[in-house]
Amino acid sequence: MTGKSVRDVERYQAVLGSLLSEEENKYCADCQAKGPRWASWNIGVFICIRCAGIHRNLGVHISRVKSVNLDQWTQEQIQCMQEMGNGKANRLYEAFLPENFRRPQTDQAVEGFIRDKYEKKKYMDRSIDINTFRKEKDDKWKKSNEPVSERKLEPIVFEKVKMPQKKEETQQSRKSSPKSTEPVIDLLGLDAPVPSTLTNGRPCSLEKDLDLFASVGLNSDSRKVSGSMPTSGSAGSVPENLNLFPEPGGKGEEAGKKQLSKDSILSLYGSQTPQLPAQGAMFMAPAQMAYPAAAYTSFPGVPPSSSMMGGMMAPSVGVMAQHGAAGMVTPMAIPAGYVGNVQAAVIGVPNGMMAAQQAGYVAGMAAVPQPVYGVQPAQQLQWNITQMTQQMAGMNFYGANGVMGYGQSMGGGGAQGSNQSLSTQLWK
């Protein structure tokens, strides 16, 4: 290859490259595939490799295919490509193509479309002379053939829309008007409230209404009426001395009067006469009860009693046995106050069996003296607190001979108790 031919090949490649850089030649003329590298120079279109194979099958009398990079081009071939191009050729061969036509994608469909387009000339505008059409300049048809998205649109100048003056005036008035300063609400009540007059002329303040931590003493009178207990002197009313939560804002003299004392509590019980059930457990019967600290020897299953209520409760279960009947055990509950003395009590044992007054027949049974029934109800109620303190003061946890018991004194209610053992007390 001579130097002249080499320079011509380079020049032809430069021309083909410039043609491929145009927007209309960047896509295949038949299937719209991107980046065509083949061309049908007699028709003057750039096509993809798939469409190039179909064009070869049409025959050289219809289409002559060459590669852009691999084949050698002549000046005549380059001139045919410059005269046509994809846009101008489609305007000729696709003049009557339907508007909603969709490009085929499969090989068989593409082949049928190419044959209809170039072989049968189904969509061709036959009124156009091809030779004169080739010599026409591209400027006449490029503008009409270019898609709308590819055309260069002239810049549109928009006029400034003037806002109505009313809105501007209102905005300026809002900016110019000073912001109304609202008073700062003092929640802790540290600052003095600034009174503000209402329409009716009364001074008020937001701080005073919203003061959550105001002094409690201001509302002490209203709280006394609604929350505190009534202080009337009737029989069913509760005295002021029982008010355990005095008002913090009250006077010092009233707070001193409301201190608790024994006399006020006793006077409260003296003014009320409630109905009490006739049970022995409610009466503080004078008794000196001794429970053995160890388990009962006659009945190992009975544990030692560990409760100490000072005359309020008797042993919950008394186990009685008959002389001569070693295997017969009769458990029964003995409430305090109803069993006067165990020594002469006849228990409901079958076959008329009676508990004897001997030391071997009763195991772990404490003597329960008879309660005092001749006391008035008011006096019995007064025992509730005073005698309770006396019992706690006179309690003797450990008596003689290692026996745990209680010692209590009931003034006028019974005889003075003494710390004695269980055996001497029961069978004396």
UniProtKB/Swiss-Prot annotation:
Signal peptide: none annotated. A zinc finger (C4-type) spans 28-51. Residues 161-172 have a biased composition (Basic and acidic residues). It comes from the Eukaryota. InterPro entries: ARF_GTPase-activating, ARFGAP/RecO, ArfGAP_dom, ArfGAP_dom_sf. One of its GO terms (molecular function) is zinc ion binding. One of its GO terms (cellular component) is cytoplasm. The keyword Ribosomal protein does not apply. Residues 13-139 form the Arf-GAP domain. Residues 161-182, 222-258 are annotated as: Disordered. The keyword Endoplasmic reticulum does not apply. It holds the Pfam family ArfGap. Keywords: GTPase activation, Metal-binding, Zinc, Zinc-finger. May interact with clathrin heavy chains. GTPase activating protein. May play a role in clathrin-dependent retrograde transport from early endosomes to the trans-Golgi network. This is Stromal membrane-associated protein 2. The gene is SMAP2.
